[in-house]
Regions:
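Conserved alpha-helix/loop element of class I SAM-dependent methyltransferases that forms part
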Residues: 38-59
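Conserved class I S-adenosyl-L-methionine
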Residues: 151-179
Length: 222
């Protein structure tokens, strides 16, 4: 068999990259929705963590693994609104340039920010998507200012997938170096796997199988 034919066959058999799988998901969502909406994000950042909108006033806010919806457009009184995602350049075809926030193309494991750059860091349905969870946590800790808040929502206990390669434990937020756990909650998942709707409904966790962990943590000041 010709070498070029073998190369073509290997290309067809190679599984899609994590980035390709993520883009396929978002492209399908855009096709269904017409335009990717973001009206739900205010309650995701506030109500789902027991916070008021004013908590974010004058703060530098970073959303790690932000996706292409414009997750921080609602935070109009924030001092800075930054979404970090390795797929930012590919998201431009989905219309992110119209959003009233900044986007930075970089992985969570290598953030191009100075130490102590942010007062609020969010990782909402993203920590199990990264390549290296430990490295991502180190970077989140580094870019968070003393006294900063980390808002964490993550699915735990699921089987690894192409886009979510890590199965994380419920105890994830209990002993993170440099952070103090202020509040946490557990929820079950709806059959349609809608994470934020599951939280809105305060769906109880049944004690077995995958579930949702929310945590609000405070960065140590010394």
């Amino acid at each position: 068999m010709a070498r070029s034919t073998l190369a073509r066959l290997r290309g067809r058999l190679r599984p899609p990259s994590k980035g390709d799988a993520e883009m396929d998901y978002w492209s399908r969502r855009a096709a269904v929705e017409g335009a990717l909406g973001n009206a739900h994000y205010e309650r995701v950042f506030t109500t789902q963590f027991g916070l008021q909108r004013s908590f974010f006033d004058a703060k530098r806010v970073l959303d790690v693994g932000c996706g292409p919806r414009g997750s921080l457009e609602w935070a109009t009184a924030a001092a800075r609104r930054v979404g970090l995602d390795p797929l930012v350049e590919r998201y431009r075809e989905l219309g992110i340039d119209r959003h009233a926030m900044d986007y930075v193309a970089a992985p969570a494991e290598r953030m191009p920010f100075a130490d102590a750059s942010f007062d609020v860091v969010a990782s909402l349905n993203s920590l199990d998507h990264v390549d290296d969870v430990d490295a991502a946590v180190v970077e989140i800790t580094r870019v968070a200012a003393p006294g900063a808040t980390w808002l964490l929502t993550v699915e735990v206990g699921h089987e690894p997938t192409a886009t979510e390669p890590h199965s994380l434990p419920w105890e994830l937020a209990e002993d993170l170096a440099g952070w103090r756990l202020q509040w946490s909650a557990r929820n079950g998942l709806r059959d349609d796997h809608d994470i934020y709707a599951s939280i809105d409904e305060n769906r109880p966790y049944g004690g077995a199988g995958p579930g949702l962990l929310r945590a609000r943590l405070k960065r140590a000041t010394s």
